[in-house]
Amino acid sequence: MIVSSRQNSATLGALRIASLGAVVPTISALALSVCLTACGGSSGAASAPAASSPPTPATTINNPTVINLYPHQSATEAPIFTVMVTSVGSVPVSMPLGFDSGSAGVTLYAQSIFPASMVTGSGFVFAAGQTSITYNGITVTNVQGTRSYGTVNQTVEHGNLGFATLTFGDAAGQVTTQTMPVFLFYSVDYLNGNGYMTPVWQGWFGVATTDGNIDVVGSIEPTGGYGACTTQSTSTCYVVSAMKYIDYGSQVNAGFMLSPTPDFPTCDITTSGNCAPQGVLTVGLNAEIESSFSTSPLTCPPNGYVGPADIGGYPVCQKTINDVTIAASGASTGTYTSGAIFDTGTAYVYLSTPVGSSFPGTVVPGSTVSLTTPSGFTYSYVAGAGTANTVVAAGAAGDSIIGVQYFTTNYFLLDFKSSLVGWK
C-alpha cells in the first residue's frame, strides 16, 4: 500500500522496492514513431502523428468475469499477487504489476513502454515549448511528481502524470479500462530496505477504495483540497482504483472479488509460461455473490480526507476497517482493537498495537491469531514463517496490516457502487 506525504502517518503498509534494470520490450519501428503535441498555448511545433492502431475499446462487464492473476514467489521475491498488463494505450507490453488492495492508482515503469529517445532515468524528453507528448494512445503531461510507498522500507517513485487505457489479463480473458490517469515513473529512490526487483516488478496496480496521490513539489493545497488528476492538473492531484475505470453494465455492481489463493509457486514471472495463471480475480459483482459474504459499510470519505467526494464515478472511501479486534492465544496471549487494512501487497502480518497495550511485543510461532471485524466475521491463522510471519509494532498506534496470509484461505470483495467490504 502507499504511504505518501499527504496520508495519515498512522496508515502503515507493505514493503515496496524496485530496481530500474527493466528489460524494455521489443517494439516495431512503426510503433516507435512519436507525435509530440503542443498543448496549453505552447509554441512548439507538432510533428506528424504516429501511424498506429487505436487503443482497444473499453470492455463492458455485463456478468461477473474471472480474470487470471499470477500469484508467485522466488528466491528473491516475497509472495506477491501479479496482474499482467498487456497493453498501455495501443502499445503492446508484457508488464507484471503488483495487484495491491492496499493502495489506489496505477504506476508503470516508463522504460518498458516508451523508446529510449523519449525517456531516460532522468525523465521524459520534451521538445522546447512542449507541454505534453502523445504516443500511441498515451498522453504524457509535463507534470512531474512522486509517489511514495512503504513504511520501514521506503521507496519514492519519480515520474510524470499520464493518461491511457490499460488492458490487463491474459489469453484466457482480458479487460480494457477507460482512459484513466496513470503515473509513468522512470526512477526510484531507495530510502531504506530491499525487496521486489525489476524486471519482475514493473509497477503497482492499486485497487483500494481510497485515494492515492501524485505529489508535485511546490503545490499549495486549496481550501477544498486537491482535485482529481486530469489533463488540466498542474499540482498535486488524486488518483483512485484502476477497477473504477472499468465499464460496468447494469447487470453487475462495480467492484471485484478475490478467491482464496493457497499456492504461491516459486517461478520466474518474466519467462512466459513459467508461472501458472490462477483464476482468482472476479471483476463485477452481483447479489448472488455478495449474499454469501459478511459485509461492512466503508467510511466515505476517509477520515481526514479533503477533496472530491467522488473520483472515477464512485465515492472515495477509507480502506481502513475501523474497530477490528485482534487476539492472540496459545503461547502468546493478548487482545487489542485497532483499524485494519486487508492488503494483498504485504507479504506478512503487521500488528500495530496501541500505546500501553497488554498485547505481547512478539507473537511466538505456533500461537493462534484471530481477527474479528465489525460485521462479526472472524478470521484465524497460526503464526509462523512465510506469509504467516507476524510482526508486532508495539505502541505504534497505527493501522494493522492483514497481508497475503488472509488471502491464502479466504475470500475478499470490494463493492464500489454500494461502498461495501466483504469477507468469507
What are the language-model segments listed below?
Residues 40-424:
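Pepsin/retropepsin-fold aspartyl endopeptidases
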Residues 23-29:
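Sec-dependent signal peptide recognition
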Residues 35-38:
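C-terminal motif of bacterial Sec signal peptides marking the signal peptidase cleavage site
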Residues 1-20:
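N-terminal secretory signal peptides that target proteins for export/translocation
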